[in-house]
A protein has these predicted regions:
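Short aromatic/hydrophobic contact patches that present stacked aromatics
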Residues: 92, 227-229, 293
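Phosphate/Mg2+-binding loops and adjacent switch elements
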Residues: 86, 90-191
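Short, well-ordered beta-strand elements
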Residues: 290-296
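Flexible glycine-/small-residue-rich
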Residues: 37, 126, 275-277, 296
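C-terminal accessory "lid"/substrate-recognition subdomains
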Residues: 42, 148-154, 159-288, 299-302, ...
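Short secondary-structure boundary/capping segments
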Residues: 51-52, 114-115, 143-144, 220, ...
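Short, hydrophobic beta-strand segments that form beta-sheet elements in well-ordered domains
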Residues: 35-36, 261-264, 294
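Nucleotide-state-sensitive switch-loop elements of NTP-binding domains
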Residues: 2-8, 13, 17-135
């Protein structure tokens, strides 16, 4: 049977970046891997981030977005039926923005998927310096995306102190408690710089499994809480782009911005931008498109647009 692994987490938490490490490890084990991602955006950023691992043993498929959850789930079922015929050993899915993880378990038990697939690992990605002043809806999403995880993997741990990582885990456990979930995390949290992950680290993640956990359901449209705004081909000089990023985080009228990411050029090549309120990184990438994505709660496009004007 084909094993399905889920990688969950907030928008901008680092799920796609972790997929690069995880999928590469699987290919090195001799498995044929398919990454199934959600094509919600105006630009397929995931393809850009994953381009260096795609090849004979690692493929990517997408499910078109822009529809209601029921339609999206039907499309997912259809896609999984198609993938079952293509000889993959592992399928990695990023399900957030579609439905709760426990609802995905139900899909895998539907015929004929139950004959071809088995549930593998649920891996939750959480920022090591997780924002802790979340709305009740966002705290619920944090709890629901981690409750069934076999392991939590902290992103950007190299930028956090041990005390900050402890605080993040404590806040995660508090969010679980507040949403009626008995699950708690401790030793099952990976707190390591992803660039230093060993085969043993990734083997532990690949064997983490999933947990059965219940929590009180909160019904709302996730897109009303978290949203992402795309700004394409703005062509700001790099020094000005850095200024704009800092301005956006400081301007409360823009909404509650949690992450800014995307791609830009410095004249010599492409750079991948990843910024939070307290840190900004720019790393070379082989090929990309000029796009900046602003992620957060109650975003104000007009206020954000005003900052893009070059001065």
């Amino acid at each position: 049977m084909v094993q399905v692994d889920l990688i969950t987490g907030f928008l901008g938490s680092g799920k796609t970046t972790f997929m690069r490490h995880y999928a590469r490890y699987m290919v090195q084990q001799g498995w044929n891997v398919c990454i199934l991602e959600n094509d919600f955006g105006a630009v397929n950023v995931d393809v850009m981030l994953l381009q260096d691992i795609l090849g004979d043993h690692c493929d990517m498929e997408s499910i078109s977005g822009g529809c209601d959850c029921d339609t999206h789930q039907r499309r997912l079922r259809t896609k999984l039926i198609s993938l079952a015929m293509q000889g993959f050993d592992r399928v990695i899915i990023e399900p957030s923005g579609i439905f709760d993880v426990d609802e995905f378990f139900d899909i895998l038990h539907d015929e004929p998927l139950d004959k071809w697939y088995r549930m593998g690992n649920v891996i939750a990605i959480v920022d090591a310096k997780q924002e802790q002043q979340l709305s009740p809806q966002s705290a619920y999403l944090l709890a629901s995306e981690t409750a069934n995880a076999g392991m939590v993997v902290l992103s950007r741990s190299q930028l956090a102190t041990p005390a900050e990582m402890d605080s993040t885990v404590n806040y995660l456990n508090h969010a679980l408690e507040q949403n009626g979930c008995a699950r708690r995390f401790g030793a099952d949290v990976l707190r390591k710089n992803w660039e230093n992950l060993t085969p043993q680290d990734l083997a532990a993640v690949a064997a983490c499994g999933s947990k059965q956990a219940s929590y009180e359901k909160m019904h709302f449209d996730q897109h009303d809480v978290f949203s992402s705004l795309y700004f394409i081909d703005r062509h700001l000089p790099l020094p000005r782009l850095k200024e704009v990023v800092n301005e956006l985080f400081a301007d409360a009228s823009c909404g509650r911005i949690m992450r800014i990411k995307g791609f830009t050029s410095d004249g010599n090549g492409w750079l991948e931008l990843n910024a939070s309120r307290d840190a900004m990184t720019l790393k070379p990438i082989a090929k990309a498109q000029e796009v900046i994505i602003v992620i957060g709660e109650q975003l104000n496009r007009a206020a954000i647009e005003a900052h893009w004007k070059e001065v």
